[in-house]
């Protein structure tokens, strides 16, 4: 049995380190049942649960409230709500603002619940000229714009010794999100790049830089960190961002005015996406 092919098969289900542990268990099985054993484990490992992460409590509060068969579970510093939304088993969590909080929460969620997919929902600032307040951005991929190891020959945004400059979202999730967006009214849906940094962007100069340097569609503070951890664990992910401001000098005022509306739209969209 050639295990390299099994690694390729199992990559969407669990990482290579975990895969090597499973090989220790199945290596003495007859060849005829080895692949079936891997497939059975993979299904159990992934389950049918979708993890939903928001940076702020207000981004997930309504979803928590709407959960059926609700169960609250604490894992370390994180309070998860497990239940059903639109008939789909989900687990929700507030990560906290910023990349470190987002990454830590994502790993905690994966370790505790082994989700089939991860959705990061919330609000963002528009970077692309065609995207405006209350529109939806579906992530094609995500990168960390404030990662700078250019002195060592890496492109701006590249994490040293990582394979990816940008972390690509899962194609089937993208396709479904675009279809759901097309079916809903009141906003336009775009596919594009999410750029993440520990900074609230509120200057035209910074906005233009992100657009030209990274071909960014929107900017926010958590998505690429969630994407990185999901990818390391072999969990398909998608970032959904409703636009709360246009990342310019008016951004603080615009954000305050439109945040609630953008979050309400996000809740409605997630409920449709889960159906």
Locations of the language-model features?
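Polybasic, lysine-rich low-complexity intrinsically disordered segments
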Residues: 7-9, 16-22, 35, 40
């Amino acid at each position: 049995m050639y295990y390299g092919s099994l690694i390729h098969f199992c990559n969407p289900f669990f990482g290579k380190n975990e895969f090597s542990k499973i090989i220790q268990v199945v290596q003495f099985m007859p060849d005829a049942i080895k692949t079936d054993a891997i497939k059975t484990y993979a299904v159990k490992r992934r389950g049918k649960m979708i993890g939903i992460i928001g940076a702020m409590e207000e981004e997930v509060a309504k979803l928590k409230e709407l959960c059926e068969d609700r169960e609250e579970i604490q894992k370390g510093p994180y309070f998860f709500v497990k239940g059903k939304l639109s008939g789909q088993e989900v687990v929700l969590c507030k990560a906290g603002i910023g990349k470190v909080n987002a990454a830590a929460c994502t790993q905690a969620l994966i370790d505790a619940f082994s989700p089939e997919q991860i959705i990061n929902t919330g609000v963002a600032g528009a970077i692309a000229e065609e995207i405006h307040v209350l529109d939806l951005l579906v992530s094609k991929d995500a990168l960390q714009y404030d990662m700078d190891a250019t002195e060592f020959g890496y492109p701006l945004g590249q994490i040293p010794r990582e394979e990816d400059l940008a972390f690509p979202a899962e194609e089937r999730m993208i396709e479904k999100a675009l279809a759901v967006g097309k079916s809903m009214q009141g906003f336009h849906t775009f596919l594009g790049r999410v750029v993440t940094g520990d900074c609230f962007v509120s200057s035209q100069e910074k906005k233009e830089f992100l657009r030209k340097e990274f071909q960014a569609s929107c900017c926010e503070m958590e998505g690429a960190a969630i994407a990185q951890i999901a990818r390391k664990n072999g969990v398909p992910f998608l970032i959904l961002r409703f636009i709360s401001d246009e990342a310019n000098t008016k951004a603080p005022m615009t954000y305050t005015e439109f945040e609630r509306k953008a979050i309400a739209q996000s809740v409605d969209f997630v409920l449709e996406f889960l159906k």
